[in-house]
Amino acid sequence: MKEIKINKKALNISITNYLLRGIFFLALIVTNKAKADNCSKIGQIGDSGVCNGMLIVDREDLKNAIADDSYTIQKDGVNYTFGDDSNNVYTGNIKNFTNLFKGKTNFNEDIGYWDISKATSLRQMFDGATLFNQDISNWRPSKVKNMAFMFRNATSFNNNSQSLNDWGEHTSKVEFMQSMFFGATSFNQDIGNWRPTNVKRMNSMF
């Protein structure tokens, strides 16, 4: 019987290479998942479908869709809307949400999934939006400095009967809250956990 000799060095190299390839592909999968969970790192404004099927939008995209009451942005033949429960626009790159729904008396759609983590201004965002009453307690306004007039005269707003306490310490950078809920006659939620330690103006807040 012929003796079979095994090149142990070559075998070890092959096994090592195989294991390294496996580790590489596993790392690639983990990295891609992490990126998919953080849309701001996976694409640019206008990219579609790269993050959980959402369209990455900027302020102008939102303004145009709101202005014509379609609440829809078209990209590559696909309609991305926040006028229903599709949840398919990503807002995490937007810093300025000022006046977006000001005076929009017909808007009451679920935008609680919006990412406002980079926002610095929510000033007058729902000012006079008399129909709006959606739950936005999952928002994290940790960089927001201006919430003045945010819900002024938003007469239906009560956060869909959900607490806004989760904003808690995320309000610590807010400087302006004047007239924030002025004329928001339905609002009656607990905000006792808020920590606006840097606030400068709170006059006529309610």
Q: Can you say where each PLM-predicted feature lies in the sequence?
A:
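Sec-dependent signal peptide recognition
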Residues: T16-F25
